[in-house]
Design a protein with these regions (language model features):
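Extracytoplasmic/lumenal domain signature
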Residues: 2-3, 7-40, 44-125, 129-402
């Protein structure tokens, strides 16, 4: 089972960026610390308030585990093979850690000594906990495997989404993953819904004009364990960033490069509806169990919310005065967090953590991120209601309820 905190980037395996933990509307910046390198994925938070960051550093440690409730005190750190910053660490409910590096998936116990390491073809995206202690690992070169999370042994069949991949060249196209270009077949982490057993991901096949969506089905206890169910080119301009699955596993939400938000049937990949955003969202939307969708972030975006009404989307509110740089992280029914441009006060520059009401878009609070540079890599919400954000330039900011 995943950790009770914020187990990995975008929260749960469905990439919903939602937690039932009631969010705090008042926050205090408790500590800030640098990873002494860069970050390309958000930090993960464990059930014990531990924080894991997968940094890219010029030397020394790169994978770090800190104590979020003790001023970021380091528990342990180690160095991974570099080049895999796009993969967020994943905590399970026993504080074991899973993280990808080019050519391997690695698991650590609550201490820094490796539990197991297994070779893969490519760079694993953020791994996903399935059922029965099984771990889904999808690499940027399109290899899909399931591992026993305790032993590290492979379970069932693998699925190769790309043909004729050279297994020895496991870093090929890796530089295209961050900007989501054609050289990286699987540039973003998959979404998994336990309710339906569906796994959905974006795939840019070699020679194809755009990235399409692919649906796989997970069959626990059966053979084959994984089957490829469908390929959808409904988003004709191509998909961008990780897809998100609804809580019941029936609908997949994804950004289109056509400045639209798309909803598709998870069972067959056929479109339900699309709605214009009037901007290109570079990070995934956030989705609540009640069907509220908050658009993703990126440069020149706006904060917009929609309600899934079945065969169409209804705009609930739009904030043209707010430009979110990150995916919004939603906590309970009434609180959302996003890193936005500027800050409190007229003419403010830099970045701030915005606290808002997802129901109506109203701003509740805003907290400046001191000396923040680069771009934000996401917002993580702990089960103790602490909120952590970080920047691509490696600065981590931890807030506590005030």
């Amino acid at each position: 089972m995943p950790a009770e905190g914020w187990p990995a980037q975008y929260g749960d395996a469905a990439n919903s960026s939602y937690t039932p933990t009631p969010g705090a509307t008042g926050l205090t910046l408790r500590w800030t610390r640098s990873v002494k390198g860069s970050l390309a994925a958000s930090v993960a938070l464990s059930s014990r308030n531990w924080l894991a960051a997968n940094a890219q550093t010029p030397g020394g440690c790169s994978l770090m585990e800190w104590e979020n409730d003790d001023n970021g005190r380091q528990r342990w750190c180690t160095r991974l093979f570099q080049g895999g910053g796009i993969s967020s660490p994943l905590f399970d409910g026993f504080d074991n850690l899973y993280v990808g590096q080019p050519g391997a998936i690695v698991s650590f116990p609550p201490t820094q000594w490796i539990r197991w390491r297994r070779p893969v073809i490519g760079m694993p995206s953020t791994p996903r906990i399935l059922a029965h202690g099984q771990l889904l690992v999808v690499t940027h070169l399109g290899q899909v495997q399931v591992f026993d999370s305790h032993r590290g042994t492979t379970v069932g069949n693998s699925v190769d989404l790309v043909d004729n991949v050279d297994p020895s060249d496991f870093t090929r196209g890796l530089s295209d993953c961050g900007p989501a270009r054609s050289g990286c077949p699987v540039a973003a982490a998959p979404a998994f819904a336990a309710a339906s057993g569906m796994v959905v991901l974006g795939l840019w096949e070699p020679g194809a004009p755009v990235a399409v969506l692919v649906g796989l089905k997970y069959h626990p206890g059966q053979s084959p364990l994984l089957t490829r169910e469908w390929t959808s080119s409904a988003v004709s301009a191509g998909v961008l960033a990780s897809p998100v699955l609804s809580s019941d596993g029936s609908t997949v939400y994804v950004n289109g490069r056509d400045e639209r938000l798309w909803a598709l049937h998870a069972a067959d990949g056929k479109p339900k509806w699309s709605v214009p955003l009037k901007f290109v969202a570079q990070t995934p939307p956030s989705v609540t169990p009640g069907g509220l969708i908050v658009s993703g972030g990126g440069p020149d975006t706006r904060l917009v919310a929609f309600k899934d009404a079945g065969d169409h989307a209804e705009q609930v509110w739009r904030r043209n005065d707010v430009s979110p740089l990150s995916t919004s992280s939603l906590a309970g029914r009434g609180v959302g967090y996003a890193v936005v441009t500027g800050g409190p006060g007229a003419g403010a520059r830099g970045m701030s953590l915005l606290v808002f009401d997802p129901g109506n878009g109203r701003s509740i609070n805003s907290y400046r991120l001191p000396e923040a540079t680069g771009y934000p890599v996401g917002v993580s919400i702990g089960h103790d209601r602490r909120v952590v954000t970080a920047t691509s330039d490696g600065q981590v900011y931890s807030f506590a309820p005030s």
